[in-house]
Amino acid sequence: VHEVSSALLLGHARPFEDEFKPGDRGIALEAALDKAAAEDRVLVLGLHGGRAENGELQAMCELRGIPFTGSGSASSNLAFDKVAAKRFAAIAGVLAPDGIELANLDAAFAEHGRLIAKPARDGSSYGLIFVNAKQDLVAVRNAAKSEEYVIEPFVAGVEATCGVLERSDGEVFSLPPIEIVPGEGAFDYTAKYLLESTQEICPGRFSPEISAALMDHAMRAHRALSCGGYSRTDFIISENGPVYLETNTLPGLTAASLYPKALKAQGIEFADFLRDQIVLAERRVRPSA
């Protein structure tokens, strides 16, 4: 963990292309959290992947009584597991694709023609494998040797995402859905952060019925997973309507990220959003705050 000035952070103009170098050696995470607890800090979480999103960091904060933004440890861990998250979303009435066992990979490819495989516990579309030909099955099997993969039939359609926001006054609502138009291929990590040709249209060009369904399903997923503060759920708009992909309990909040675009479309200033999330974080730990 490093202590970094606002000026240094703001001066890092290309965060997804150039690695940020904080300049000091930093201290261990546990020591930094002990320091935050002693100083009565509130943490605004902006980390991604691994222990930052799987509930481990959140549990470390909870054990120390440190207020933090976003979902708690149990919800974070549940949403980070794509298999479990799909199951809970389906219980809430959200359409989710069927999973495919690795042993049935060849038969599933013969039946569906196209498949998609992704790490069961990761974010930002890391590790996506599109199975469009038989030789792609080898890549899936090799990837599944080192970590668990979710394998599903490929669902054709428009990519969409929809945020949910909880406010300190008790109001909870869905933000305007965003339509994603990848410039080249699929909306993987490169398309999300590096390709200028990718379009993120907010509000999306959806029919009123599809927009309403996206907002309803995002809210259902948020509640089914017991998310806190804010979340963002990704979908594919198939011929049968929105199909659930995953829920992000710590969606990106950079200038290139989707959630701030939805806040802007809703007429919410980003600074006001952060201030309100800090109030919520304090209130969870200190109810009188």
How should each PLM-predicted stretch be described?
Residues 59-68, 133-138, 266-267:
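A glycine- and small-aliphatic-rich helix-loop capping segment at beta-alpha/alpha-beta transitions
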Residues 4, 67-68, 96, 115, ...:
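Hydrophobic beta-strand scaffold residues
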Residues 207-289:
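ATP-dependent carboxylate activation and anion-phosphoryl transfer catalytic cores
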Residues 59-62, 187-194, 249:
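Short, flexible, mixed-charge acidic loops at enzyme active sites
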